[in-house]
């Protein structure tokens, strides 16, 4: 879900209180996260690690049911695979997706991947990255020399809220069910995918 401006401002104000940060940190620790994993969640907001194995272990044990359509802008290397005429796609890394179609359009546009290709799919189980990343930001302790930590925290929470990101584990298998054209500023190709299973 997308958080309101008032909710994010409330998170920011409360996160200025050390006791609130400590309470949220304890909540994450009680859910099985360690401090390094909490930092990894924050790192993933802007840049996923090259090695997804650690991230994959984090999300596999925290999947929740999902019945909503997901959207993903397709990067160039995946577009090349699609051009080979395949029917089955197995993701060998953790896959990010959004509940917001416009986020996928942005990533597929010339502003990011410049592929004009999007996936539309459902995954029965997802990791709610948005929820945990917001919590990780709310409990983050910044270096004392870091300037404007609360503004930085707020901007990152805005980004996480806007992207409405979830993740699915590496080894997720989908079948290409359909393909159609979609026009918005430019013409996009949207592939609809049916979930086949987890090859974990």
Curated annotation (Swiss-Prot):
NAD(+) binds at residue 72. Its EC number is 2.4.2.31. GO terms for cellular component: virion component. Changing residue 164 to A: No effect on enzymatic activity in vitro. The keyword Lipid metabolism does not apply. InterPro entries: MODA-like. It catalyses: L-arginyl-[protein] + NAD(+) = N(omega)-(ADP-D-ribosyl)-L-arginyl-[protein] + nicotinamide + H(+). Keywords: Glycosyltransferase, Transferase, Virion. The active site is at residue 165. It is an enzyme of class 2 (transferase). GO terms for molecular function: NAD+-protein mono-ADP-ribosyltransferase activity; NAD+-protein-arginine ADP-ribosyltransferase activity. Changing residue 163 to A: Complete loss of enzymatic activity in vitro. It is found in: Virion. The keyword Glycosyltransferase applies. Changing residue 116 to A: No effect on enzymatic activity in vitro. Belongs to the Tevenvirinae NAD--protein ADP-ribosyltransferase modA family. ADP-ribosyltransferase that efficiently ADP-ribosylates both alpha subunits of host RNA polymerase RPOA. The ModA-induced ADP-ribosylation of RPOA alpha subunits inhibits transcription from viral early promoters. This is NAD--protein ADP-ribosyltransferase modA. It comes from Enterobacteria phage T4 (Bacteriophage T4).
């Amino acid at each position: 879900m997308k958080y309101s401006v008032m909710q994010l401002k409330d998170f920011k104000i409360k996160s200025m209180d050390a006791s609130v940060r400590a309470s949220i940190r304890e909540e994450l620790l009680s859910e099985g996260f360690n401090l390094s994993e909490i930092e990894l969640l924050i790192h993933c907001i802007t840049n996923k690690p090259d090695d997804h194995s650690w991230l994959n272990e984090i999300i596999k044990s925290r999947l929740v049911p999902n019945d909503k359509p997901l959207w993903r802008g397709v990067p160039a290397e995946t577009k090349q695979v699609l051009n080979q005429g395949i029917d089955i796609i197995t993701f060998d890394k953790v896959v990010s997706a959004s509940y917001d179609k416009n986020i996928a359009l942005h990533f597929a546009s010339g502003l990011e991947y410049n592929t004009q290709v999007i996936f539309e799919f459902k995954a029965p189980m997802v990791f709610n990255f948005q929820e945990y990343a917001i919590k990780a930001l709310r409990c983050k302790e910044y270096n004392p020399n870091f300037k404007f930590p609360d503004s930085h925290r707020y901007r990152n929470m805005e980004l996480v809220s806007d992207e409405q990101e979830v993740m699915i584990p590496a080894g997720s298998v989908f079948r290409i069910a359909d393909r159609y054209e979609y026009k918005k500023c430019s013409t996009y190709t949207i592939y609809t995918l049916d979930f086949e299973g987890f090859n974990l």
